[in-house]
Amino acid sequence: MINAFEDHTPVIGPGTYVHPSADVFGNVQIGAGCWIGPGARIRGDYGRIVIGDHTAVEDNVVIHARPDEQTTIGDWVTLGHACIIHNATVRDWAVVGMGAIVSDWAEIGPWAVVGEGAVVRQNQQIPPERIAVGVPAKVLDKTVTDAYKSEWKHWKEVYVDLARRYPAGLRAPGNR
């Protein structure tokens, strides 16, 4: 459901799909060609939420910001199922794994990966093209490879395609 909150109405870019069970409200701007999955909650009630183009916000993701602050999600980002992004910045092409938490004022660099279930603490910086795992998240002595980038580009395109297919393809059983 997309709703205004007080004086703010979400702005949804062309070709972006918001699932009917997702909630997007308040001071939210979502770019073009994004996928907002079932159960996602994008709350622009306290602060502002900005999501770039071609980003996948998978099922049950929560995105929120502190009062008068901003959460920023870049272009071509993947936010895995049930992760929480709170008052943080996630740069272009980054991946936040399922169930991970990215807390206040943290920053995830371009092409960085936050592993499933990891907790990125307040003010923590995950450098570009690095992998962070664990509770609290620790940056591994590994970098994201070109092969990994190529594979993830493919999967990111899959979500862009879903954003295109869902408006016509999602229907009640028996309805064609």
Language model region names:
Residues 30-54:
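Generic amphipathic, hydrophobic interface segment in small proteins and small subunits
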Residues 1-11, 45-48, 53, 59-61, ...:
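Glycine-rich hexapeptide-repeat left-handed beta-helix
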Residues 1-36:
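N-terminal segments that cap or nucleate solenoid repeat domains
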